[in-house]
Amino acid sequence: MFEARLINATILKKILDAIKELLHEATFECSESGIQLQAMDNSHVSLGSLTLRSDGFDKFRCDRNISMGMNLGSMAKILKCANNDDTVTVKAQDNADTVTFMFESPNHEKVSDYEMKLMNLDQEHLGIPETDYSCVVRMPSMEFARICRDLAQFSESMLICCTKEGVKFSASGDVGSANVKLAQTSSVDKEEEAVIIEMQEPVTLTFACRYLNAFTKATPLSAQVQLSMCADVPLVVEYAIKELGHIRYYLAPKIEDDES
C-alpha cells in the first residue's frame, strides 16, 4: 500500500506545472524514503529530476517500493479539480494498475476522489555523475525567468558567461543583441534577493532558450534558483521545494556548429 498526503494541494499543482511541459509522461518511483522521478524530455535533449522526501509529507506510507507510470497531462487535469486549500492524498495498492487522488476541503464537508489508470513506461534510470562545478550561481528565480524570457526574443540560443566579476547572459540574432549582467550582491536584507557566485574557474557556455524557458516553469516553487556549470558538462538548474525536496533540470550545452 502506498499513501502520501499533503495539507495543501497548491504545492502539487506547482510541481506538476513545473514538469508537464517538458515531460509528457513519467514514472514516479516511491519508496519509504520518498518519491523520485527522472525522465528525459520528448526530444531527449534535457533531463528532469524530482525528489520529494517522505518527511516533507503530512502523512507518508510506502510498504514496498512501487513504480507508477503516469500521463502528466491527465494528472494535471485531475489536480485542476482540487481547490488550492484542499488536502490531497495520493493512494495506490501494491501491484495496482490505477492510482487514486483524494481531495478534502478544509472543513471536511467535501471529499472527492479521482482514479487514474497507470501506464507501463519503459524508462531507463540514468546515472548522473557527481561533478565539481566550475561555477555555481544562486540568484532570484523570477530574475532568471525574466532574463530567459527577454533574451529568447533575440535568439534561439543564450550564452551564459560566469567570471569573478559576475554572471552575464547574452543573446544575438537578426534583430540585434542583448546582454544582461548581474554582479554578486555585496549586502542584501533578504536572502532570496541575493546573487551569489562561487567560481573555481571562468565558464562560458551556450544553451537553447526554449529549454531554459521550460525550466523556469518551476519559478513559483522557489524564490531562488541555482545554476551549476562546468565546461562540456550539462548545466544543472535547481529549484528547492521548501521542506519537501527539489526539482533539477539538466541541459547539455550547444556545440558551436550545432544547429539544433
Curated annotation (Swiss-Prot):
This protein is an auxiliary protein of DNA polymerase delta and is involved in the control of eukaryotic DNA replication by increasing the polymerase's processibility during elongation of the leading strand. CDD domains: PCNA. NCBIfam families: pcna. It is found in: Nucleus. InterPro entries: DNA_clamp_sf, Pr_cel_nuc_antig, Pr_cel_nuc_antig_C, Pr_cel_nuc_antig_CS, Pr_cel_nuc_antig_N, TonB_box_CS. The keyword Nucleus applies. Residues 61-80 bind DNA. One of its GO terms (cellular component) is PCNA complex. One of its GO terms (molecular function) is DNA binding. Homotrimer. Forms a complex with activator 1 heteropentamer in the presence of ATP. It comes from Sarcophaga crassipalpis (Flesh fly). The keyword DNA-binding applies. GO terms for biological process: leading strand elongation; mismatch repair; regulation of DNA replication; translesion synthesis. Keywords: DNA replication, DNA-binding, Nucleus. Belongs to the PCNA family. Its main location: nucleus. HAMAP family: DNApol_clamp_arch. This is Proliferating cell nuclear antigen.
